[in-house]
Amino acid sequence: MARKLGRKTDSRMALLRNLASDLIIHERIETTEAKAKELRSIVEKMITLGKRGDLHARRQAAAFLYNKETDEDNNVIQKLFDDVAARYEDRQGGYTRVLKLNERQGDGAKMAIIELV
């Protein structure tokens, strides 16, 4: 892991799991630039697992992502394997885009939007 994000390991992994789950659900989130860049590699790996589509890949993704509800019928794992992976079936990597924004007014942190392409 390249960036520590000012947190200890457990807190950092919980943050990234939460952000990865939210990105898969909403397909676009606004966060700091460092978090977005760190999140990019994790989400790319999750989408690659989704494209593989076998039981072991599903269990690996379920072990990392939080089991959040996307709507009444689906959760984040179902959305990853059914919707998101199918969309990128012909694409070899590069599933996310990081767009830089202005600094946050309160503390001047560099902000960015990370979204699924």
From Swiss-Prot:
Presence of keyword Ribonucleoprotein: yes
InterPro entries: Ribosomal_bL17, Ribosomal_bL17_CS, Ribosomal_bL17_sf
GO biological process: translation
GO-annotated cellular components: cytosolic large ribosomal subunit
Pfam families reported for this sequence: Ribosomal_L17
GO molecular function, one term: structural constituent of ribosome
The entry's keywords: Ribonucleoprotein, Ribosomal protein
Superkingdom field: Bacteria
Family: Belongs to the bacterial ribosomal protein bL17 family.
Assembly information from the UniProt record: Part of the 50S ribosomal subunit. Contacts protein L32.
Protein name per its UniProtKB record: Large ribosomal subunit protein bL17
Organism: Oceanobacillus iheyensis (strain DSM 14371 / CIP 107618 / JCM 11309 / KCTC 3954 / HTE831)
Name of the gene encoding the protein in the UniProt record: rplQ
